């Protein structure tokens, strides 16, 4: 027995408690690969072993969704034969297009009462096209659109502080910065 035994037993118990909380619903594990370092002597191995057993024994009570970057997820599934056989479906979600990112930004702005000029929408298209063309595996997708919107509101506030007559709810092209 390892000196970690009491801790791994406690960790297994806490993992099982969390899994049981999801009975009748969905257990969502974001960046699931971060659970497992590849060693059988870590807590992540215990978490995955516990998860595999629950996925098998209680498949009628539990839906498990694991999310993460494709390469890391594939590595995780390859590290444990038991988990691969219990994962029925894998779905690859593609990045949003630049047009979809403009739409996400625009919907968020309109929801908060902002007006975007045609020129502003055109500038958004340019910014998102550049971001999309230069994206890497950490590209933020909808998060990038929301982040740009938050930056834009700050930029717009700075502009409004210098121009008392400007419309408070109109976003101008100069309010949009590069991602």
Task: Kindly give the residue locations of the regions a language model identified.
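C-terminal helical "lid" subdomain and adjoining coupling/linker elements of P-loop NTPases
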Residues: 131-179
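Conserved alpha-helical scaffold flanking the Walker A/P-loop in AAA+ ATPase domains
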Residues: 11-28, 48-57, 82
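Conserved RecA-like P-loop NTPase ATPase core
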Residues: 15, 30, 51, 64, ...
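Short, small-residue-biased leader/transition segments that mark boundaries at the very start
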Residues: 3-10
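Conserved catalytic/switch belt of AAA+ P-loop NTPases
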Residues: 33-65, 71-84
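Conserved nucleotide-binding/hydrolysis micro-motifs of P-loop NTPases
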Residues: 4, 33-35, 69-74, 95-101
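Conserved C-terminal "switch" segment of AAA+ ATPases
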Residues: 75-78, 84, 93-138, 157-163
């Amino acid at each position: 027995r390892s000196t970690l035994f009491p801790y791994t037993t406690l960790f297994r118990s806490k993992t099982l408690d969390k899994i049981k909380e999801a009975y009748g619903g969905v257990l969502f594990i974001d960046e699931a690969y971060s659970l497992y370092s590849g060693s059988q002597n870590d807590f992540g191995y215990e978490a995955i072993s516990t998860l595999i057993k629950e996925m098998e024994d209680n498949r009628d009570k539990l839906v498990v969704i694991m999310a993460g970057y494709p390469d890391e997820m594939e590595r995780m599934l390859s590290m444990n034969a038991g988990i691969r056989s219990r994962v029925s479906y894998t779905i690859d979600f593609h990045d949003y297009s630049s047009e979809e990112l403009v739409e996400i930004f625009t919907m968020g702005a309109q929801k908060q009462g902002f007006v975007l000029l045609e020129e502003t929408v055109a500038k958004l298209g340019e910014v998102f096209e550049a971001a999309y063309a230069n994206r890497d595996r950490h590209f933020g997708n909808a998060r990038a659109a929301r982040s740009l919107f938050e930056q834009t509101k700050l930029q717009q506030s700075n502009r409004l502080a210098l121009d008392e007559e400007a419309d408070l709810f109109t976003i101008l092209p100069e309010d949009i910065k590069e991602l």
